[in-house]
A protein has these predicted regions:
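ATP-binding N-terminal substructure of ATP-dependent carboxylate-amine bond-forming enzymes
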Residues: 1-93, 97, 119
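Active-site nucleotide/adenylate-binding loops and adjacent lid/helix of ATP-dependent enzymes
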Residues: 91-180, 184-231, 318, 352, ...
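Short, low-complexity Ser/Thr-rich regulatory SLiMs
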Residues: 183-187, 245-249, 326
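Protein kinase-like catalytic core scaffold
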Residues: 192, 241, 253-257
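Short, flexible active-site loops
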Residues: 204-214, 257-270
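Active-site "cap" helix and flanking loop/linker of ATP-utilizing ligase/carboxylase catalytic domains
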Residues: 222-243, 249, 259-307
Length: 373
């Protein structure tokens, strides 16, 4: 089967690498004019002139990035199956619709307001109590389109810096850790769930994801499973869905945002789970049985950002797996990730710190459960 992928970056690349053993072929449609997948057949189409050529080659279509024109995906749906559907993109690329969906399904979120002026932003900051986080309703990812207000008087500056006509303003959450759920749903409605991962962000960009969590209460995992299962069923979803959450001090979970695709916080599954998120996504969209999501060992994903480190020394570390994206170095750019696998979380922390020391731009590792090791 020829899988069509909208986008030609590292997520599409890793989908292809997971799909070749399944006998899949891949055709990428790149609308940026700057593809970086370095694999498969790429149709570069910044002027939207080659959609018919793309459709003629593929059997089913998926995507690696949700910030696509909904109209493009809806047009493709007239000709080929698209998984996840355009409805998932429509919700996930608009924070107002996303929050409304969470509210409708009784999935708790931080308190929020929708504002359309600097004056409304200031009023919302006073009502919710600072600090608050202001986010663009559309186009925000990896910390872009956001500002933290420490006082209501900062509203005018924040409004101007974000530069959007509508913002979501969220109350600041005193969380213990940021976590994420990765789940996959097949065409037949079967759903499977990966163990929850703890994520460490710096400047809004993910740096480390670790799973499974040694101190995670079973009930918390079950609650997260229920939340994401509700979303999967409501959207009649097919493929991998990621749900990012805050875990508070009392163990409750607050939904932050979701992503309708394979996700950076699920990269640990490539070496730390029986079936990777990439293979399971491909199984789902082709109507194949879903693979086991069981973790085989404590695993940490380390993002390599901006500048590569000493890869030779890194590969000398036992059970350390380097996944390079074949991209040129540039400040803030995701170049690769490293999956570190160990028999215990104590050993894992030691190995991740050894890996971190070999990366020039890697921040210190901070895990919420470190004191219990």
């Amino acid at each position: 089967m020829n899988i069509g992928v909208l986008g030609a970056g590292q997520l599409g690349r890793m989908l292809a690498l997971a799909g070749y053993p399944l006998g899949n072929r891949f055709t990428f449609l790149d609308t940026t004019g700057n593809p970086s997948a370095g694999i498969g057949e790429v149709i570069v189409d910044p002027d939207n002139q080659h959609l018919a050529e793309f459709l003629a080659k593929v059997d089913v279509v998926t995507y690696e990035f949700e910030h696509l024109p909904v109209s493009l995906v809806q047009e493709i749906e007239k000709h080929k199956p698209v998984y996840p559907s355009s409805r998932a993109i429509e919700v996930c690329q608009n924070r107002v619709e996303e929050k409304a969906l969470f509210d409708r399904l009784n999935i708790p979120t931080p308190a929020y307001r929708v504002v359309e002026s600097a004056e409304q932003l200031e009023a919302a900051a006073r009502e919710l109590g600072c600090p608050v986080v202001a986010k663009s309703v559309t186009e925000g990812y990896d910390g872009k389109g956001q500002a933290v207000l420490k006082a209501p008087e900062e509203a005018a500056e924040a409004w101007q810096s974000i530069g959007h006509a509508q913002l979501i303003v969220e109350a600041f959450v005193d969380f213990v850790r940021e976590v994420s759920m990765i789940a996959v749903r097949g065409r037949d409605g079967e759903a499977v769930f990966y163990p929850m991962a703890e994520n460490q962000h710096v400047g809004g960009i993910l740096r480390y994801s670790v799973a499974p969590l040694p101190d995670l209460d079973v009930q918390v995992q079950q609650t997260a499973d229920t939340y994401i299962r509700t979303l999967l069923d409501e959207l009649d979803y097919v493929g991998v869905l990621a749900l990012e959450l805050f875990q508070t001090r009392d163990g409750s979970l607050l939904a932050n945002e979701m992503a309708p695709r394979v996700h950076n916080s699920g990269h640990w599954t490539m070496d730390g789970a029986v079936t990777s998120q990439f293979e399971n996504h491909l199984r789902a969209i082709q109507g194949l049985p879903l693979g086991s999501t069981v973790a085989i060992a404590p695993t940490c994903m380390v993002n390599v950002i901006g500048q590569e480190g000493d890869n030779v020394a890194m590969l000398k570390l036992a059970n350390t797996h380097l996944h390079r994206y074949d991209k040129a170095e540039r400040a803030g750019r995701k170049l690769a990730h490293v999956n570190v696998v160990a028999t215990t979380h104590t050993e894992l922390l030691e190995k991740v710190r050894a890996c971190q020391a070999l990366l020039p731009d890697a921040p210190p590792v901070e895990w919420s459960f470190e004191s219990s090791l």
